[in-house]
Amino acid sequence: MTAHEMAKGILESVQSLKPKKERNLIAIAGPPGAGKSTLAEIVTDLMNENLMKTSLVPMDGFHLDNKTLKRANLLDRKGAPETFDVKGFTELIKNLRYKRNLSVPLFDRSVDEVVKNARKIPAEQEYIIAEGNYLLLNKDYWRDLYNYWDYKVFISVDKNILKSRLIERWLSENHTYSEAEARVLKNDLVN
């Protein structure tokens, strides 16, 4: 199934949600390299094309900064559940339920840091699509998110395909093949 076919199925399911005063929150989760970001962007575009006012909120905007990770000896594990500000993300999701103007942080991969207030979420938005690895994780503080989602999607992909995609991702960021493979095996696939 292609990302566009999946997106159309998600659109149809979301269109069947009962209307309510609060925003509908949709979670798209899965491992690194599964295609969450691509799928979330396609779904967001489709929903907006269908006059469903929708904004996208990536979980990656809640990476802890590199200094904090270094102090905690977690820099080599960046991307693991404990390397995110899960309490801050949960608070944002609580606030996104209500139709008011908000700003959300985004992760800038080119500088490996979070950019605060990088995306504006206008009050008139009716749907929020959140995407990230741990949105449906049943562990520690992450499990507190589960009941906020009105619709949930988990993308499952064969581990060999993930490995190949993740190595390509690191190669595109000017890492050697051995560096890329080491990062994928030591960190990305573990996450």
Name what the model sees in each region:
Residues 36:
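Conserved lysine of the Walker
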Residues 39:
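Hydrophobic positions on the alpha1 helix immediately C-terminal to the Walker A/P-loop
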Residues 42:
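Active-site signature of alpha/beta-hydrolase-fold catalytic machinery across serine-
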Residues 45-55:
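Post-Walker A helix-loop "phosphate-sensing" segment adjacent to the P-loop in P-loop NTPases
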Residues 55, 64-111:
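Conserved nucleotide-sensing/catalytic segment adjacent to the nucleotide-binding pocket
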